[in-house]
Structures are given as structure tokens and as C-alpha cells.
From Swiss-Prot:
Organism: Burkholderia multivorans (strain ATCC 17616 / 249)
Name this protein carries in UniProt: Polyribonucleotide nucleotidyltransferase
GO cellular component, one term: cytosol
InterPro entries: ExoRNase_PH_dom1 (IPR001247), ExoRNase_PH_dom2 (IPR015847), ExoRNase_PH_dom2_sf (IPR036345), KH_dom (IPR004087), KH_dom_type_1 (IPR004088), KH_dom_type_1_sf (IPR036612), NA-bd_OB-fold (IPR012340), PNPase (IPR012162)
PANTHER family: POLYRIBONUCLEOTIDE NUCLEOTIDYLTRANSFERASE, POLYRIBONUCLEOTIDE NUCLEOTIDYLTRANSFERASE 1, MITOCHONDRIAL
Lineage: Bacteria, Pseudomonadati, Pseudomonadota, Betaproteobacteria, Burkholderiales
């Protein structure tokens, strides 16, 4: 009899067979599940602390998705030959898993929970992110932790006007959509996608299709819990202190109502801090008078936050103006300026209300492309977008350094939004880096990065297919009343039930991201929200087109210029030279960057047109073939008793025999030629060994004959 109580569930899902198992590996974790999808295997584990730390006032959930190089049969690079800091892909996948799980833990549950997913085996055609999300959901479900799941997930492609469930990487190449949706039996919780300018109804159809298809996975997790789940935790939320809630409401509500009539963010924030401080002080006075201990600040802070949410949500649902005085459909005032920075290749300052992005575009060569060593194999990225939000953007102090998960996620969303409208590498051979520096933030900075990014690219002369704009939306739902908010503020983001970001062109959507905190948002509500988002997007696109009608036709004088030439692939080694000596000398002496592809396409880039022309000429000379009958201006390299060695082209010499110098007999070659002398010669013979015979005499004879017949000699 086995020492393991192993439980296995299998199901067919789209074109793949999925296997879930628990009870054999990582038994000391609160929950552990192995997910196997056609040889892509992940181990998802969950550990929950039995009690919350004293004074804990937030839910400490961490999700770590870790790719092991052995899963693809590789040994890691680097000196230590072991996995190091998380890659950008691992960070993004960790966020993807975190987002649908977090809202399903009960309010007031502050025990530390850690979800760790290891990728153990990889089929290059099956991405590991969906198996990882299903595994994390299943591990939480079998652990017995208080979790309102399970969660299912699906990737949806759109190929030949048909939705495809969990496509392979090969299918994704021909898809106009890459959408990941996660949710429970009843509701969608998270959407992450990029698309090729698709209409809103196609995007929403993909969300609904994915949600329907994920029910198979949810059913399998339920069966796994039934046969292999641990007992549910006996956890109850701490009873609410109704007397304290009533007292805090009595003290703070009038002041909070007054604070939310202040339209300026900084002034409102100052007033709210004063209300929090005054409320705590008043409660301490009450406790002192009663001879009791004052309530801890974390509890009071949570009550005040709930009170703020109630006030703001109530005002909006009752049709009153929003925090900054707008109605639900109005976009904040927009100002646009391009060409902001004098020596960059392209720049734009995009300001929407109290959110501002300074976005810079830089053009580079093929050598500047990012090389990514992924599990599935190495590939190159010609378009990079980096998002930075320093603490001063919100008037705060804080750490400045390497990007945090949020910054990486926002950068990827902005990149997804723009990539569909970039020209192909054949149309525009440059590598492109866009950096968005958030200089002010009050909501929707990632969408400001999309708008500013598009404008900076156009300023740099990148021939974009269309203007791309992004807008952040919010939604508040109370019973059967709901309100969709256009262009949300930071405060509205925290207090709403759904926030979603839509980016796209006048033709359609290029990126959609949704995060839903409650279970009650129907397809019809999402339809209304997407229609209102389109209205907002079209307004912003109008402002952008007014400011910048299209891409600059001239590149910045500081951007590199490029020319391409085609050479015989067999000649590549001649251009590179032994140990790279020839190409190194070429780049240093001409001040150019030279990239050579395996098929013989040579790209020469430089800010100097003279340098490019010189490099082109030299490469053409190196790769040129010596042809019989051709005339060359050569240099005498060496004098011999029987003739001279003449250099015709780089690395290509020929013999000028003593009998081929002039018509008369030559007694001493030194009387006619000197080393270093320029001499015009004609190729009269080559052999299979590459030896070349030259003649100067032939040109003299041709000149004499031409003089007699009045026809010009061969040049």
C-alpha cells in the first residue's frame, strides 16, 4: 500500500488534456497541486499562517511564479549557474495570478498567505501561465483556507473570425487576439489582453466565451477538493465594534463630507489627514475620560476608509458630482506638447487633469534589440516600453531604484496597447525604446503612457498605423443601481467595484485590462461600460489628432540613419574578418554600427551620412568579385624580379607580370614601378585557385587603338 493518498482528476479542455493531482508532492504545505497540460507541468503550493500578526491591518498575500531552467532542459547562464532574480515574464505572471485570487479572500482575513508556483516541465507550444493560475486556485481550494473560489482561467485567441480556447504558441502567431480571462462559476474577475484593433463586441464575446469554457476546470477542482481536500479552517471574522463604528461616524462624517467637496487633490488629501488625526485624538479623549484603552489606529483607519467609500459611492449613485466636480462621462482637461526635449529622438508631454507623463522615444539599430532568454528559446524584442513612477509624482517621499511589480505591469500594458499599430521591421528597420516618466499621478497613469507613447513615437518619425489612446474606467454597483465612471481618479480606483483600462484606435481595441472586486457584474453591465469607454477614447483621440496629425516625415538629426545592402552570404566571413577584426576596424574608422543577418542583409547605421557612405563603399569592395576584363585602380604592394603584386580590392591581389607593364622590354622593374604607387590595370585572366593576372600594357594598347579610331578607351 502506498504511503501517499494521491488524488488525480483529468479532463479534456479545448485541444488539450489536463491532469490535476494532489497528495503526493509537498504534503507539508497547506495545499499543493500538480497541473500537467500536455507536458507543461507546474507545482502550485499554498501556505497560510494560522493567525494574523498583531496590529495587521491589510491582507498580506504574496504570489511567486518561478520558472526553473531544467524544465526546458537547460542550464542557467551566469557565473553561479543557478536561477537569479525574477525575469519580467515571471513578475508579470505572478501579477496575473495574484489579481483574480486576491478579491476572493474574506474581508478581515489578515493571515499571511504565500502562493508559490514552480514550472517543472515545459512544452514550448503550451504557455505555463494558465496551468499556473489553475494550479494556484486548486491549491487554495484543497488547503481549506477561507477562500471564495475556486477560480478558473482560460486563454482565448481569435483566428479566422473564430474564438479558440487555449491556443498553442503557433496558433497565437496568426491570432488577432491574445486574451486571458479568470473568474469563478458566477463571475469574471480578471481580463488581460492585447488585440489587433478589434471591435468592443468581439472583445466582450471573447471574455464571455472564456468564462463559459473555464467552468470545466472549475468542476474538476471541485472534484479534487471533494476527494483530496483538507478540512475547512474554522475562521470567523472578528465581530464589528458597532459602538466604535457609530462613534467614528458621528465624529468624522460631517468633516469627511466637507473634505469630499474639495476639488483639488492636494488640498483634499491634507483635509483628509486632518480628519483622521482629529478623529484619533477625539477617541483618545473619550478613552481617557472613560478610563479605557483607545481603539488601535488600524481599526479606526479601516472604519474611516469604509466611511469614505460609502460617502463617495453614495454621491455618485445619487447622481451628484464626482470628487473633482465632473459628471460620470467627462474626461479631464487634456494638454499635449511634443518635441519637448531638444536632443532626444522624439518626446511628448501628455497632461490629463492631475496626471502627467513625459514620454521619450529613442530609435536604435538591430544591435540595440533586447535579447530575451526565455524557457521556450531565445528571441529578440525590437520594441521596448519602460514605465517609471517616482514618489514625487504623488507628492510623497519614497524609495527610488529598480522597477517594482506595479511599474513592470503598467509598462507591459502600455506596450500591449501600442504594439499593434507599430510599423513592421520591413517598413521601419529601427529598434524602438519608449520610456514613460510619470511626473504627476492622480489615476490612469498607464493610459497617459499609452497616449504620450503614441505621440512621442510620432514625434520621432515612427510611421504609426493610427493614433492610439487609452482610458481608465471605474464602476460602482449597489444592488441594482450602477454607475460607470470615465477617466477615474486615484481615489475612485480604490473605492470602486471594478476598474478597467481600454486602449485602442478609432477602428478598435488594442488592449483591455479588467479587475473586478465583486461578483455581480453581468455581461450587460460590461457592455455599457465598454461603450462608455469607447466614447471617452474617441474624445481623447480627437484631442491627440488636433495636436499631432501624423508622424513626422523627418527623423531627428540626432537619430541614426540606416541603409541596407545585400551581399553574398558566403562573403559574410570576409566582412567580419578573423576574430571580428575587419568589421571592428570598419565600425571604428567610419563611426557606424553594422549588423549582418545570416541571409546577407547588411544594415549600416550612423548619425553621419559620410560615414555610412564610406562603410558601404568598403563593404562593397570587400565583397566584390574580381572579373576578367574589368579595370581597377590598384596599389603596388611588392616588387619582384618578374613583376609586381598589385592590391585591387581589400584582401584581393593580382600579379602584374614584367612583360605586361609596357610594350617594350623591361630590364629593371624599378624603372617603371615603386611600392605604394597607384597603377591602373586590367584583369586578363583568373584561375580556379583564385590567382589573378593583370596587364597595364593592354590598357596602353587600347588607348592607342582608340586614338586611331576616335573611340574612347575602356575606363
Amino acid at each position: 500500500m502506498s504511503m501517499f493518498n494521491k488524488v488525480v482528476k483529468e479532463f479534456q479542455w479545448g485541444q488539450h488534456k489536463v491532469r490535476l493531482e494532489t497528495g503526493e508532492i509537498a504534503r507539508q504545505a497547506s495545499g499543493a497541486v500538480i497541473v500537467d497540460v500536455e507536458d507543461t507541468v507546474v507545482l502550485a503550493t499554498v501556505v497560510g499562517a494560522k493567525s494574523a500578526k498583531p496590529g495587521q491591518d491589510f491582507f498580506p498575500l504574496t504570489v511567486d511564479y518561478i520558472e526553473k531552467t531544467y524544465s526546458a532542459g537547460k542550464i542557467p547562464g551566469g557565473f553561479f549557474r543557478r536561477e537569479g532574480r525574477p525575469s519580467e515574464h515571471e513578475t508579470l505572471t505572478s501579477r496575473l495570478i495574484d489579481r483574480p485570487l486576491r478579491p476572493l479572500f474574506p474581508e478581515g482575513f489578515y493571515n499571511e498567505v504565500q502562493v508559490v508556483i514552480h514550472v517543472l516541465s515545459v512544452n514550448p507550444e503550451i504557455p505555463a501561465d494558465i496551468p499556473a493560475l489553475i494550479g494556484a486556485s486548486a491549491a487554495l481550494a484543497v488547503s481549506g483556507l477561507p477562500f471564495n473560489g475556486p477560480v478558473g482561467a482560460a486563454r482565448v485567441a481569435y483566428v479566422n473570425d473564430q474564438y479558440v480556447l487555449n491556443p498553442t504558441r503557433e496558433q497565437l502567431k496568426s491570432s488577432r487576439l491574445d486574451l486571458v480571462v479568470a473568474g469563478t462559476e458566477r463571475a469574471v474577475l480578471m481580463v488581460e489582453s492585447e488585440a489587433d484593433q478589434l471591435p468592443e463586441e468581439v472583445m466582450l464575446g471573447a471574455v464571455v466565451f472564456g468564462h463559459e469554457q473555464m467552468q470545466t476546470a472549475i468542476d474538476a477542482i471541485h472534484e479534487l477538493v471533494r476527494d483530496g481536500g483538507k478540512p475547512e479552517w474554522d475562521w470567523q471574522p472578528a465581530p464589528k465594534d458597532e459602538a466604535l463604528i457609530a462613534r467614528v461616524t458621528e465624529i468624522a462624517q460631517p468633516e469627511l463630507l466637507a473634505a469630499y467637496q474639495i476639488r483639488d487633490k492636494q488640498a483634499r488629501s491634507t483635509k483628509l489627514k486632518e480628519v483622521y488625526a482629529a478623529t484619533s485624538a477625539k477617541l483618545e479623549e473619550d478613552a481617557l475620560a472613560a478610563g479605557t484603552v483607545a481603539a488601535d489606529k488600524a481599526t479606526v483607519g479601516n472604519i474611516l476608509f469604509d466611511l469614505e467609500a460609502k460617502i463617495v459611492r453614495g454621491q455618485i449613485l445619487n447622481g451628484e458630482p464626482r470628487i473633482d466636480g465632473r459628471d460620470t462621462r467627462t474626461v479631464r482637461p487634456i494638454e499635449i506638447r511634443t518635441g519637448v526635449l531638444p536632443r532626444t529622438h522624439g518626446s511628448a508631454l501628455f497632461t490629463r487633469g492631475e496626471t502627467q507623463a513625459l514620454v521619450v522615444a529613442t530609435l536604435g539599430t538591430k544591435g540595440d534589440e533586447q535579447i530575451i532568454d526565455a524557457l521556450e528559446g531565445e528571441y529578440r524584442e525590437r520594441f521596448m516600453l519602460h514605465y517609471n513612477m517616482p514618489p514625487f509624482a504623488t507628492g510623497e517621499t519614497g524609495r527610488v531604484g529598480s522597477p517594482k511589480r506595479r511599474e513592470i505591469g503598467h509598462g507591459r500594458l502600455a506596450k500591449r496597447a501600442l504594439v499593434a499599430c507599430l510599423p513592421s521591421a520591413e517598413e521601419f528597420g529601427y529598434s524602438i525604446r519608449v520610456v514613460s516618466e510619470i511626473t504627476e499621478s492622480n489615476g490612469s497613469s498607464s493610459m497617459a503612457s499609452v497616449c504620450g507613447g503614441c505621440l512621442a513615437l510620432m514625434d520621432a518619425g515612427v510611421p504609426m498605423k493610427a493614433h492610439v489612446a487609452g482610458i481608465a474606467m471605474g464602476l460602482i454597483l449597489e444592488g441594482n443601481k450602477f454607475a460607470v465612471l470615465t477617466d477615474i481618479l486615484g481615489d475612485e480606483d480604490h473605492l470602486g467595484d471594478m476598474d478597467f483600462k481600454v486602449a485602442g484606435t478609432a477602428q478598435g481595441v488594442t488592449a483591455l485590462q479588467m479587475d473586478i472586486k465583486i461578483q455581480g457584474i453581468t455581461k450587460e453591465i460590461m457592455q455599457v461600460a465598454l461603450a462608455q469607454a469607447k466614447e471617452g477614447r474617441m474624445h481623447i483621440l480627437g484631442k491627440m489628432t488636433e495636436a499631432v496629425a501624423g508622424a513626422n516625415t523627418q527623423l531627428s538629426e540626432f537619430a541614426p540613419r540606416m541603409i541596407t545592402i545585400k551581399i553574398n552570404p558566403e562573403k559574410i566571413r570576409d566582412v567580419i574578418g578573423k576574430g571580428g577584426s575587419v568589421i571592428r576596424a570598419l565600425t571604428e574608422e567610419t563611426g557606424t554600427t553594422i549588423d549582418i543577418s545570416d541571409d546577407g542583409v547588411v544594415t549600416i547605421a550612423s548619425t553621419s551620412s559620410e560615414g555610412m557612405a564610406e562603410a558601404k563603399k568598403r563593404i562593397e569592395n570587400i565583397t566584390a568579385e574580381i572579373e576578367v576584363g574589368q579595370v581597377y585602380e590598384g596599389t603596388v604592394l611588392k616588387l619582384l624580379d618578374f613583376g609586381a603584386i598589385v592590391n585591387l580590392l581589400p584582401g584581393k591581389d593580382g600579379l602584374l607580370h614584367i612583360s605586361e607593364i609596357v610594350n617594350e622590354r623591361v630590364k629593371d622593374i624599378n624603372d617603371y614601378l615603386k611600392e605604394g604607387q597607384q597603377v591602373k590595370v586590367k584583369v586578363i585572366q583568373t584561375d580556379e585557385k583564385g590567382r589573378v593576372r593583370l596587364s597595364a600594357k593592354a590598357l596602353l594598347n587600347e588607348a592607342a587603338a582608340a586614338a586611331q579610331s576616335d573611340t574612347p578607351p575602356q575606363q
